[in-house]
Amino acid sequence: MSNNKLLTDEQKELYSLMLPIYGAMVKQNNTAKILNTSIATLYRMRKQGIGASYKKLESNSKNGTVVYPLQEIVRYITESNVKTA
């Protein structure tokens, strides 16, 4: 896991629910669905240095393949929540 941060109990529960559906590494199209956004928005977020952490895998394409570790998506979803009273 990135930054050696452990998942909270809430994050572990969400991760365990999503893992059988999406796998440990999530492609951009599924990440966009999970975050209810577009692939273009994910691209802009990466360029701005915001959003979930991602990995760029080497491939035959000139730009490589971008994937998102599921634990980073879970962390992003839960840590970007605003707590209300």
Predicted regions and their residues:
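A detector for short, charged/polar N-terminal pre-domain segments
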Residues: M1-G23
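A short, Lys/Arg-enriched interface patch at domain edges and termini
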Residues: S2-N3, L70-A85
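Intrinsically disordered, low-complexity segments enriched in glycine/proline and serine/threonine
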Residues: E13, G49-I50, R75, V82
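Short alpha-helical interface patches
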Residues: M18-L19, K33, T78
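Major-groove DNA-recognition helix of helix-turn-helix-type DNA-binding domains
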Residues: M25-Q28, K33-V67
